[in-house]
UniProtKB/Swiss-Prot annotation:
Compartments where found: Cytoplasm, Cytoskeleton
Designated name of the protein: Tropomyosin alpha-1 chain
Known role: Binds to actin filaments in muscle and non-muscle cells. Plays a central role, in association with the troponin complex, in the calcium dependent regulation of vertebrate striated muscle contraction. Smooth muscle contraction is regulated by interaction with caldesmon. In non-muscle cells is implicated in stabilizing cytoskeleton actin filaments.
Biased composition (Basic and acidic residues): 12-37
Species of the source: Danio rerio (Zebrafish)
Subunit structure and binding partners: Homodimer. Heterodimer of an alpha (TPM1, TPM3 or TPM4) and a beta (TPM2) chain.
Spans annotated as Disordered: 1-37
Keywords: Actin-binding, Coiled coil, Cytoplasm, Cytoskeleton, Muscle protein
Family, similarity comment: Belongs to the tropomyosin family.
Gene Ontology cellular component terms for the protein in this record: actin cytoskeleton; actin filament; cytoplasm
Length: 284
């Protein structure tokens, strides 16, 4: 009888312990469920935040796409500009060659002008000599009337030479005028070439400035891409951490539920054993 009582007390104590463990397991389960719910809420919040980040990333991706298209357009323009620069360089080379030829022609014209001026000077000196001779002949005519016929002959000869020299002078003056016109024409052409060269130089400077501007924009787009990539990696890391935490909590809940189920089975077995003992006592 004492053994039965002792066994009943032990069974009762085991039952109480089982009930305590069951209550503790139920409490742990509720706490775990609350923690799981909190983590689920956190996960939902993180998912919303991740969704917002993805939306923002999509927006920046679209902006990046536009930026890349603009960059490609800028690169195309830069390539076209480089082609224009090469074309302008070739044109400048042709202009420089034409300028060299114009300078050579101008030097030739100046040389001819100098020769014409020398010829005009010689003609002028010849005219002065003839004039001096005519004056001397007139003096001789006044002083020596007996030599009138000879003086007239000398005068006629002098007039003839004078007319010939005058005719040559007219020809030289005409050549001089044409030479001056050609020189002025060459000078005008040189001025036009200089203006065109200035325009080409300014266009080259403008193209270089545009190329630098496109390069600065390209650096800015690359920096934005790097920032967005870092944000995406950070969001993915947070999402992976949240998923691992949820998986860990779900495993903890499963373990607690298994333990609770085991405690319930143990409690059921103890209750059945206690009932059998009570039945045995009643039968006695």
């Amino acid at each position: 009888m004492d053994a039965i009582k002792k066994k009943m007390q032990m069974l009762k104590l085991d039952k109480e312990n089982a009930l305590d463990r069951a209550e503790q397991a139920e409490t742990d389960k509720k706490a775990a469920e609350e923690r799981s719910k909190q983590l689920e809420d956190d996960l939902v919040a993180l998912q919303k935040k991740l969704k917002a980040t993805e939306d923002e990333l999509d927006k920046y991706s679209e902006a990046l796409k536009d930026a890349q298209e603009k960059l490609e357009l800028a690169e195309k323009k830069a390539t076209d500009a480089e082609g224009d620069v090469a074309s302008l360089n070739r044109r400048i080379q042709l202009v420089e060659e034409e300028l060299d030829r114009a300078q050579e022609r101008l030097a030739t014209a100046l040389q001819k002008l100098e020769e014409a001026e020398k010829a005009a000077d010689e003609s002028e000196r010849g005219m002065k000599v003839i004039e001096n001779r005519a004056l001397k002949d007139e003096e001789k005519m006044e002083l020596q009337e007996i030599q009138l016929k000879e003086a007239k002959h000398i005068a006629e000869e002098a007039d003839r030479k004078y007319e010939e020299v005058a005719r040559k002078l007219v020809i030289v003056e005409g050549e001089l005028e044409r030479t001056e016109e050609r020189a002025e024409l060459n000078e005008g052409k040189c001025s036009e070439l200089e203006e065109e060269l200035k325009t080409v130089t300014n266009n080259m400077k403008s193209l270089e400035a545009q190329a630098e501007k496109y390069s600065a924009k390209e650096d800015k787009y690359e920096e934005e891409i790097k920032v967005l990539t870092d944000k995406l990696k950070e969001a993915e890391t947070r999402a992976e951490f949240a998923e691992r935490s949820v998986a860990k909590l779900e495993k903890t809940i499963d373990d607690l539920e298994d333990e609770l189920y085991a405690q319930k089975l143990k409690y059921k077995a103890i209750s059945e054993e206690l009932d059998h003992a009570l039945n045995d006592m009643t039968s006695i």
